[in-house]
Amino acid sequence: MAGGNFRYSLAVFNSGSQLLHETLIKPDWLPALEAARFQALCSVGSISGKETISPSWHPSCGQPYISGVRACVNVGSNGEGAIDIPMTYFRPHADAVVTALVQSGALVEGEQILYSVSAFLVPDEPVTEKLSYGSLSVERQCPLRGARSIAEFECNIKATIGSGGANFPVFIPKAILDEAEALKEGAGDVETGGIVIGHLWQDPAAGPFVVVTAFIPARHTLAEKTRLTFTPETWADVNAAINLRTAGESYVGWIHTHPCRVWCHCPEPEKKVNCGYSLDFFSTTDAYLHRCVFYGAHQIAVVLGDRFLSGKGWKTTYSGYGWDHGIIVSRQFYITDGSVERQSFEKRETNGKTTAG
């Protein structure tokens, strides 16, 4: 970081503002910097430059207390991409402390807590941890495919899935969700899933949007009732499928299932309707995989779960997730009839054919 290096300290208080624990933390800055890269991509068309994380000092408490941080990618004379990261970015660190306090008996489970974060300048300490502290200058592959009109896809919207807002539109053909649901039904009592590939486009007027073009079922996985593990063979298989398509597609996210009807042991239909397992959720294991593989600010996740409807039995549900300010949140997706995606692929296939004379 220009001017020095910052260390961050987390303090956790009970509802009576009594300090329970204070500790140094090492935030994972990659999602925050990905959010800044996405801003740079949308505003100046580049993601390569000097990357910084700087504290945003608390407006009333002042230094060393912060209200968040500012992630920035400076691409030189072309400009920069910057985004303000809120305090909720540090919530996982607070949750980890709370878990330890509950286990030690210092805090009652369910008790409300407060937390604060402070930043301290350490000017003479060298930067040693990539994406933890300081400034970085890296070369990255640009995920933007090019310019395209979003109107082509908006006119084919048939429905929406997921809840919450959306910092950019995502279009998914219904046929892809049908494929995923068929995979879910065939998996029985274990989780299953796959990778969704497609393109990140930029509409000159409306901004960026993602188009999902295909679903690649994940093979060579370790599937359990409450966990799906992708192996090196899984990723090799997916990459081979992408290369065979030769459509310039890239990972835009993943789909996996929560077989809630298997998890639910409620004896009566009325209790099944309100079963906690049937609620939409993105587990800590899900979040870990998303962070490790799908950390790009434009990359998304879809979860197929189950909900019990009185008189109708179990029904598949869809929930959507994605990045917003470096944090995984619930979000909405548009479901299309897939006609534009299909026509584009068929046109490319036709143009790629060679006729022997």
Predicted regions, residues:
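Conserved beta-strand-loop surface patch within small alpha/beta domains used
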Residues: 1-251, 259-357
